[in-house]
Design a protein with these regions (language model features):
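Intrinsically disordered, low-complexity regions enriched in glycine and serine
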Residues: 1-5
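Short stretches within intrinsically disordered, low-complexity N-terminal or propeptide regions
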Residues: 164, 448-451
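Acidic, Ala/Val/Gly-enriched low-complexity intrinsically disordered segments
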Residues: 6, 11, 18, 22, ...
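TRNA-recognition modules of translation machinery and tRNA-sensing kinases, especially anticodon-binding
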Residues: 58, 168-435, 440-443, 449, ...
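Aromatic (phenylalanine/tyrosine) cluster motif
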Residues: 13, 20-23, 430, 445, ...
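N-terminal alpha-helical targeting/anchoring segments
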Residues: 23-184, 188
Length: 458
């Protein structure tokens, strides 16, 4: 850990800093620690390049980051040498004063060193910003068990995600042995408010409409596309399912945590990828008049994991405590998403909507317990889904569709008879962060594993 005693803000490192000189470096949230790229300190740049290849990213970015890091370290060395030279000049002041010599030349020399140090420190900050911006774009190490494909589906429509397990059954009464064009026609007919052809199964939103619990037309008039009203039985079902999920997780020693629904930009930038800012996040302008700068700029949360990442911001977690007891939260929140990249997709039904409720597992654990915890969370999701009587399958997501933070991700997909297809209901992402803007662990060498998954949502 690094920090200062003279009024300096504590900066949390999960690897020892190169020296105890405190530099004004940024602290973004990055899946890859810069130490992984420093071969002279035991890092393995080729391992990072290979992981980028698995993600179908350009591995040359790794070399650009290494070059910028070398430039930053040279700047730091130059700044240290200038400080040493300035200290020598400062010592000469005492000698000149005793001998009653003119100290004006020394003052000029000291000022020259001061100016050079300031310029070099500014260069350090600029280079670090460039380096860290690129470092943020590097993805976490892809786990060896992840299927290496660029997309979830091959050009011929074949699923490339690995199916890990299945539970229940698939009832295909809607489109038995039908051709694609027949299937498309039946989809259109089945979308009618009264249901589909004889023997067809109604979709979930059609059932809810028949119960008087769902009104998308009124929602669109009030909030625009992908908005809806829940009414009567729909509201009751929503809250009942949330409470059921909360009680389920509390019984598994999770602590309920309801976060604020918006976050400061500087905190959000530590937990969300830049692409999400435009595609997923709603920007909230204005802010409290007492707030200044970035504190006034906020974003609505897309998932409770974002604010929960900041719950322990600037706190110290002892390694032995984390080893003994992982921190387990059940995040309960409304979520807001722009779905900017979903134009024309899933326009009917309660899919890809702008607002929904979610109960989520969120675990901070020691890396040595991380994969064990990941599997435990998957088992919790299976048990929960089975308790609802749903059929599902678990798929291991391909490397090309993992976000930068995830080393591995499971999706649970429930069988939707009305759509004759599996649809995602749960994602369980595995994230190991070498250093974090949000939390530190009491050890020089320890990283932290953060795992999260929605337990349920409507």
């Amino acid at each position: 850990m690094g920090g200062g005693d003279e009024g300096l803000q504590i900066v949390i490192f999960l690897h020892p800093p190169d020296s105890f000189t405190v530099y004004p470096t940024p602290t973004p949230n990055m899946p890859i620690d810069i130490e992984e790229l420093r071969a002279f300190k035991g890092g393995d740049p080729e391992k990072v390049r290979e992981s980028e290849r698995r993600r179908f990213n350009d591995p040359s970015r790794v070399d650009t980051v290494i070059a910028l890091d070398e430039q930053w370290r040279k700047c730091r060395g130059d700044a240290d040498n200038l400080r040493k030279a300035k200290r020598l000049v400062s010592k000469q002041f005492q000698v000149y004063a005793k001998e009653k010599k003119d100290v004006a030349p020394l003052r000029a020399q000291a000022q020259e060193f001061t100016d050079k140090i300031a310029a070099k420190e500014k260069e350090m900050v600029d280079v670090a910003a460039q380096r860290d911006a690129l470092l943020k774009q590097l993805g976490n190490f892809v786990h060896d068990s992840v299927p290496v494909f660029e997309h979830e589906e091959a050009p011929d429509g074949t699923l490339q995600n690995a199916i890990e397990s299945k539970h229940g059954w698939e009832t295909r009464r809607v489109f038995p042995d039908s051709k694609d064009q027949d299937k498309e026609e039946l989809l259109k007919r089945n979308a009618a408010p009264g249901g589909g052809p004889d023997g067809a199964m109604l979709k979930h939103h059609q059932l809810l409409q028949r119960l008087g619990g769902y009104n998308p037309e009124a929602g669109a008039r009030v909030g625009g596309s992908r908005c809806y009203f829940l009414k009567g039985a729909g509201v009751s079902l929503n809250y009942a399912l949330q409470m059921y999920a909360q009680n389920f997780l509390v019984n598994q020693d999770y602590t309920l945590l309801q976060p604020p629904y918006f976050m400061r930009k500087d905190v959000m930038s530590g937990v969300a990828q830049l692409a999400e800012f435009d595609e997923a996040l709603y920007h909230v302008g204005g802010g409290d008049e007492t707030e200044k700068g970035e504190e006034r700029e906020k974003y609505l949360i897309a998932t409770s994991e974002q604010p929960i990442c900041g719950f322990h911001m600037n706190e110290w977690i002892k390694e032995k405590d984390l080893m003994a007891n992982p921190i387990k939260y059940a995040g309960v929140s409304t979520c807001f998403r722009k779905e900017a990249g979903s134009s024309g997709r899933d326009t009917r039904g309660i899919f890809r909507v702008h607002q929904f409720e979610k109960v989520e597992q969120f675990v901070i654990c020691h890396p040595e317990k991380s994969w064990e915890q990941h599997e435990e969370m998957l088992m919790q999701c299976k048990t929960f889904t089975q308790s609802l009587g749903l059929s599902y399958r678990v798929v291991n997501i391909v490397s090309g569709d993992l976000n930068n933070a995830a080393a591995k991700k499971y999706d649970m997909e429930a069988w939707f008879p009305g759509y004759d297809d599996f649809r995602e209901i749960v994602s369980i992402a595995f994230v190991v962060l070498g250093w974090l803007v949000v939390v530190g662990c009491g050890s020089w060498f320890t990283s932290i594993a953060i795992l999260f998954s929605p337990c349920c949502f409507l």
